Amino acid sequence: MTVNPDAPALPTLPLAVETIQGLLPHRYPFALVDRIIDYVPGERAVGIKNVTFNEPQFQGHFPGRPLMPGVLIVEAMAQVGGVIVTLMPDMPQGLFVFAGIDQVRFRRPVVPGDQLVLSAQLLSAKRRRFCKIQGEAMVDGQLAASGELVFSLVE
């Protein structure tokens, strides 16, 4: 399998945050992946998100009992999936956004101090503009969240 010639060259793993920023458009406070630790072109990727107390969402979600919002866990899974899609062979460059979020389940709370291990597996890619991934978020070997995420290319 070849890598998209227009995409940045894939350096040696792990991919640091600076490399991830070269692949994804997200920036603070929505850059939610700190490192990519595993990557198989066109198939899967595994990333790390270190959850810290000084993140802005914890000011209001919830005072005295901070919990990472589920929507941000889903977004973090999607960003790991975005690494797969961005580096896929023959995939046009552009902005991929959510087209669907299916069968998402939250199994345990994610709190400051946790390390999310985010895995994304490519399920399908259609017409060079739609991709579906299966995402999982784990903390200490326990499933925190999972679901299917669908992306669409915005022109």
Curated annotation (Swiss-Prot):
Active site: H61
Keywords from the named record: Cytoplasm, Lipid A biosynthesis, Lipid biosynthesis, Lipid metabolism, Lyase
CDD domains according to UniProt: FabZ
Superkingdom, natural source: Bacteria
Predominant cellular place of this UniProt entry's protein: cytoplasm
Compartmental location: Cytoplasm
Transmembrane segments: none
InterPro entries referenced in this protein's UniProt entry, alphabetically: FabA_FabZ, FabZ, HotDog_dom_sf
Keyword Metal-binding: no
One GO term describing the cellular component: cytoplasm
EC number of this enzyme: 4.2.1.59
Biological process terms in GO annotation: fatty acid biosynthetic process; lipid A biosynthetic process
Biological role: Involved in unsaturated fatty acids biosynthesis. Catalyzes the dehydration of short chain beta-hydroxyacyl-ACPs and long chain saturated and unsaturated beta-hydroxyacyl-ACPs.
HAMAP family xrefs: FabZ
Protein name in the entry: 3-hydroxyacyl-[acyl-carrier-protein] dehydratase FabZ
